[in-house]
């Protein structure tokens, strides 16, 4: 029998809340994530399974999967296949830092788009002088490619944090109360470590963190090191701290680069990672189980007798 596991922390909260990074746990090796679980409350889990060829397994049945809490059976009360899509928000720094690399940035974005699955909904925004749509959410790749040429330099400082906060707010509103037509948001942003145009208060940053966690957002970041400009200590480090924290919380990828030429090869790498994540996240099983009376969940495991499977078990369905 093969299994995968998650570690939990008990809490007095009445609902299951993912408050720390939840990592997909492989059947071969078991990296473990955490979540807050209230004793006696039903536990909701997401199980993603693929075969030896990496193709999603779409015919698992409830009787083939055993959920246990701290070694005791957790009775499955609901077992359903989900096919939630990925919705990708791409945010691009168009401040003076990228003036000399505008052609490279556009070429990198085109390569990025070409590497994405065509069924992923994409939106494209620039971040200076404020976050604004260059291409609104859609799947028309011809129009998206044409929109890349509309990214033009602006003399103002980029608003890296504001762009992420607004994207998180949109995702939260779109997902609010949705049982049908749910989705997994992914944010990809290109920024720089120079002066930041956003001036967020602590509560606004905390809201950004909270919304990304609660809505199973994955955040990926490319940060260009701007050696030719002096950092503004008051604002120039804010986007770095926020960016690092977001990628740590959501399991995303953070890359600091020194040369603009790296964009051409790096952005397609991100697209490939997003494509793989999309394939796994979009075909999962949402499982609800009831822990035994008196249980104070610390460890949740899933086991199956089905051979030749590789699986990921999470509390929110996010597989970066």
Question: Where do the language-model regions lie?
Answer:
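N-terminal secretory signal peptides that target proteins for export/translocation
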Residues: 1-14
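Bacterial N-terminal signal peptides
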Residues: 17-31
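Eukaryote-biased intrinsically disordered, low-complexity acidic regions enriched in Ser/Thr/Pro
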Residues: 36-97, 106
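C-terminal "exit" segments of structured domains
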Residues: 41-43, 248, 259-320
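Von Willebrand factor
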Residues: 81-137, 160-167, 186-190
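Extracytoplasmic/secreted cell-surface and envelope-processing proteins
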Residues: 98-100, 132-135, 195-203, 228-233, ...
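Exposed acidic/Ser/Thr-rich ligand/metal-binding surfaces
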Residues: 129-130, 137-220, 226, 241-244, ...
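Von Willebrand factor A/integrin I-like adhesion domains
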Residues: 220-279
């Amino acid at each position: 029998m093969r299994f995968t596991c998650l570690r939990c922390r008990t809490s007095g909260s009445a609902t299951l809340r993912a408050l720390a990074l939840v990592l997909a746990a492989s059947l071969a090796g078991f990296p473990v994530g955490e979540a807050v679980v209230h004793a006696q409350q039903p536990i909701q889990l997401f199980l993603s399974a693929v075969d030896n060829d990496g193709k999603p397994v779409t015919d698992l049945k409830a009787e083939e999967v055993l959920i246990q809490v701290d070694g005791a059976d957790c009775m499955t009360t609901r077992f359903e296949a989900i096919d939630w899509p990925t919705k990708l928000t791409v945010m691009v720094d168009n401040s003076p830092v990228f003036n000399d690399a505008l052609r490279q940035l556009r070429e990198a974005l085109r390569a990025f788009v070409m590497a994405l699955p065509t069924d992923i909904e994409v939106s494209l925004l620039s971040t200076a002088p404020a976050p604004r749509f260059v291409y609104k959410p859609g799947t028309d790749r011809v129009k998206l490619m044409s929109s890349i040429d509309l990214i033009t330099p602006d003399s103002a400082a980029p608003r890296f944090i504001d762009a992420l906060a607004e994207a998180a707010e949109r995702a939260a509103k779109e997902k609010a109360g949705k049982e049908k037509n749910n989705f997994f948001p992914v944010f990809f942003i290109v920024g720089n470590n120079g002066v930041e145009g956003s001036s967020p208060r602590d509560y606004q940053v905390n809201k950004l963190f909270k919304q990304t966690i609660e809505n199973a957002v994955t955040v990926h970041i490319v940060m260009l090191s701007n050696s030719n400009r002096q950092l503004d200590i008051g604002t120039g480090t804010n986007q770095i701290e926020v960016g690092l924290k977001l990628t740590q919380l959501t399991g995303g990828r953070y890359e600091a680069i020194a040369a603009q030429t790296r964009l051409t090869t790096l952005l397609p790498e991100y697209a490939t990672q997003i494509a793989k994540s999309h394939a796994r996240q979009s075909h999962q099983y949402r499982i609800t189980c009831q822990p035994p009376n008196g249980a104070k969940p610390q460890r949740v495991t899933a086991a199956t007798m089905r051979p030749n499977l590789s699986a990921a078990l999470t509390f929110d369905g996010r597989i970066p």
